[in-house]
């Protein structure tokens, strides 16, 4: 399955559970570990867990191998590793504190869900 298709499925899974501030970053020029990073926010620990679970279920149903996931216990920051696509789901305070978008080069997101797209989508 193409990276863009995996990303699209992950974003749809996040939207299904009302994830907020969903962005996709193209990390292909920054690391060889993965091609895309998707970041989303959940309003509560329970929603963060549900968002991550939704991503895992949707990707598995499409035949995508899940390499691993972490953070389900606390529900503050859950990571889902689908190989070339990595999904981070966080509480708002955790996302603000770690600001991983800035850590990955301070780049503009390649895709912001639900927002005007002043730059081209991947």
From Swiss-Prot:
GO cellular component: cytoplasm
Annotated localization: Cytoplasm
InterPro entries listed in its UniProt record: Iojap/RsfS/C7orf30, NT_sf
Top-level taxon in the UniProt lineage: Bacteria
Family: Belongs to the Iojap/RsfS family.
Oligomer status and interactors: Interacts with ribosomal protein uL14 (rplN).
Its biological purpose: Functions as a ribosomal silencing factor. Interacts with ribosomal protein uL14 (rplN), blocking formation of intersubunit bridge B8. Prevents association of the 30S and 50S ribosomal subunits and the formation of functional ribosomes, thus repressing translation.
This protein's name: Ribosomal silencing factor RsfS
Native organism: Chromobacterium violaceum (strain ATCC 12472 / DSM 30191 / JCM 1249 / CCUG 213 / NBRC 12614 / NCIMB 9131 / NCTC 9757 / MK)
